[in-house]
Design a protein with these regions (language model features):
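Conserved core of the PLP fold type I
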Residues: 58-186, 198-220, 325, 368
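Short strand-turn motif at the edge of the Rossmann-like AdoMet-binding core
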Residues: 195-197, 224-225
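PLP-dependent enzyme catalytic core of the Aspartate aminotransferase-like
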Residues: 2, 85, 334-335, 348-382
Length: 382
């Protein structure tokens, strides 16, 4: 029997983690909670799905290594990551970025006791790191790339950065990454990046792997195809490592899985090629239009503002003023509308998120408009 999950919304009660909130939304047509891509297929993507029988046959006939190599070549090339180490077994395919994160966390736990982690960020990252016994030191995202991180870097073995960040959309610039990687190299720290939202923001399409390689630091990057395309969660999370990482990533990977489905890899290749042929630019326009739907739909509501005016990510934060985000969430649930309250993103200080909601933008226009109207109504009633 499937477990029933509830998330109480009363003040002072345990509200669970963000994935539990997202789970509650899965069966609602007005789910704007999770950041998975749930919009309609484009015409080009629909043709790929129509060709699934041929994709299956191709995946069955070709060597797995060839299918995997073509998939990550198409995906990494699409996003400007031309220096990724694709030819020497350092790109490990996982079922999801969370599986990649679990493998990385277990690898780190045997080599260090503490990790500096960007703040805020999605709470499954700190949950997984803490779950293997690591202590966490929060680093405000605006400090990353600065020269004065000595107070943090002297006490940790790894620095973990989400870029673009979830939920803020902030991108660590090429200059900032180079500076941070240099500091990690000087102290022999591991620099770990989660780039799951990279595809949405051209500012994140500079060649991270070139910067990391040239810095001389030990590094790990988690990539994720699951946020970009509405493939019903058929996706790949890649775990990419430096040659001199010095952590048992490959061994722990082999403890957990053999690989991912070649058919999913073939699907990722085709969707990447479609994106390179104009689909990615179309996606950027689509997300921008949906962001405008939310901002215009909430215009004039007293007390609200949008904390991330320059975000290109497929999520949008809404600050609800003096209102409680949990109370707004509860009111929306009465309309069968689901968003994410942001307390748990602020994993080191949850009250910082008490008045903020996160809205997913990778949705078809009609349900997003309906959900935004309901949000406006609930906000005006409070």
């Amino acid at each position: 029997m499937q477990e029933t999950r509830t998330v109480p919304a009363g003040p002072g009660l345990d509200v669970g983690n963000l994935t539990q909130f997202e789970y509650l939304a899965l069966n609602s047509p007005l789910n704007i909670a999770d950041a998975h891509a749930r919009q309609e297929l484009t015409a080009g993507q629909a043709r790929i799905i129509d060709d699934l029988p041929n994709l299956f046959l191709k995946a069955a006939e070709l060597p797995v290594e060839e299918v995997e190599r073509e998939a990550h070549r198409a995906y990494f090339g699409l996003l400007g990551q031309h220096s990724y180490p694709g030819d020497d077994g350092r790109v490990l395919a996982c079922y999801s970025s969370s599986v990649a994160m679990e493998i990385l966390a277990r690898s780190l736990a045997g080599a260090m006791s503490s990790v500096a982690l960007i703040h805020p960020t999605f709470d499954n990252i700190p949950d997984i790191l803490r779950g293997v016994g690591l202590d966490l030191v929060p680093v405000a995202e605006e400090r990353l790339g600065e020269d004065d991180l000595d107070d943090v870097l002297g006490s940790v073995g790894c620095v973990f950065v989400t870029t673009p960040n979830n939920p803020t959309g902030r991108v660590l610039s090429e200059e900032g990454l180079s500076r941070l990687a240099g500091q990690c190299a000087e102290r022999d720290l591991v620099l770990a990046l989660d780039t799951s939202f990279r595809g949405f923001d051209p500012a994140g399409h500079y060649d991270h792997y070139r910067v990391l390689r040239d810095s001389g630091c030990r590094w790990v990057v988690i990539e994720d195809t699951g946020k970009l395309w509405p493939t019903l969660d058929l996706k790949v999370g890649w775990l990419v490592t430096a040659a001199d990482l010095g952590l048992p990533v490959a061994k722990i990977y082999s403890d957990i899985l053999l690989g991912v489905s070649p058919m999913v890899l073939a699907l990722v290749q085709r969707f990447s090629e479609d994106a390179a042929d104009g689909g990615l630019a179309d996606l950027h326009r689509f997300v921008a239009e949906n962001r405008a739907v939310v901002r215009e739909g909430l215009a004039g509501v007293p007390g609200i503002h949008f904390p991330d005016p320059h975000s290109r990510a497929s999520v949008e934060r809404v600050h609800v003023g003096a209102r409680s985000a949990l109370e707004v969430w509860s009111g929306l649930r009465d309309h069968n509308v689901y968003v994410l309250p942001c307390q748990k993103f602020h994993w080191a200080n949850p009250p910082e998120g008490n008045s903020t909601l996160r809205i997913a933008l990778a949705r078809s226009a009609a349900p997003l408009r309906e959900a935004t109207r309901a949000l406006r109504s609930v906000l005006l009633a409070r």
